A protein has these predicted regions:
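N-terminal cysteine/histidine-rich coordination modules
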Residues: 1-85
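Amphipathic alpha-helical repeat scaffolds of TPR domains
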Residues: 81-166, 189-203
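Inward-facing hydrophobic residues that define packing positions of alpha-helical scaffold repeats
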Residues: 127, 180, 214-215
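"A position-specific structural signal for the A-helix of alpha-solenoid helical repeats
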Residues: 195-203, 229-239
Length: 244
């Protein structure tokens, strides 16, 4: 069962406006979804980023680690009628319920009405985030570009009825190859990214390079399994995204 925390209020680093977000408390996994060669699995939440979203106030990308955490909201809005308030005043409000209600009522309306952070999940979301801040740190740029790669590949993923998960515009098609080449630059020399590197080379049609990279993957109990499967695709000169 997927469950979320009570709302957490943050201040946007760009406009100082407020937004709310929820963290995952527990997550439901579907056992019958495919695992794809680009590293994205079929879980509904797989491509969404929990590290960055779109501020509902100024509509710019906001990284959670840059946003100031203001407060945690209660899961349910504190409310109390007149008789309840009188009772708690007379009895000393021993459990603090009246204090909680009064503190809530004293909060600015704008804070209480803060809208949710808009999560990035579509290709255009990640393109916009990269365009807004072209001087991202390598780690942040990689985070966005990998998810853009996944989102652009969604046109090749299919649901249970054989329908493509997403369409792709001309602009998105034109950016797909440069995006993959840039990811290759960003992961150059990273031993942990060898499977990703091999898959990118395969999708770019550089099959011999892909095979060489995948054969050199260091076993860790999982990576080598993916590497062997992707290597077979590269050896067969198959460049398209494939379920593993």
């Amino acid at each position: 069962m997927t469950r979320y925390s009570a709302p957490i209020i943050h201040q946007c680093p760009a406009c100082a406006g407020h937004f709310k977000r929820h963290t995952l408390v527990s997550m439901h996994f579907h056992a019958d979804v495919p695992d794809w060669s680009d590293g994205k699995n079929g879980q509904w939440w797989a491509s969404a980023s929990v590290s960055v979203g779109r501020c509902p106030v100024c509509s710019t990308s906001a990284w959670i680690e840059d946003a100031v955490e203001v407060m945690h909201f209660p899961r349910h809005t504190p409310m109390m009628g007149g008789l309840g308030r009188l009772w708690h005043r007379m009895t000393g409000d021993r459990n603090g319920r009246l204090r909680t209600v009064l503190e809530w009522e004293a909060l600015p309306v704008a804070l209480k009405n803060a809208e949710s952070l808009g999560w990035l999940s579509e290709a255009d979301d990640f393109i916009a985030a990269l365009t807004e801040a072209p001087q991202q740190s390598p780690e942040r740029e990689l985070h966005l570009r990998v998810r853009l790669w996944w989102a652009l590949n969604d046109r090749l993923r299919h649901d249970g009825g054989g329908t493509p998960s997403a369409s792709q515009s001309l602009m998105q098609r034109s950016i797909a190859r440069p995006n993959m080449l840039r990811i290759l630059e960003l992961i150059e020399g990273s031993p942990k990214a060898q499977v990703t590197r091999g898959e990118l080379l395969r999708q770019l049609g550089r099959f011999d390079e892909a095979v060489a990279v995948l054969k050199a993957v260091i076993p860790d109990g999982r990576s080598e399994v993916r590497a062997v499967r992707i290597e077979r695709l590269a050896s067969a000169r198959i460049a398209a995204l494939q379920p593993l």
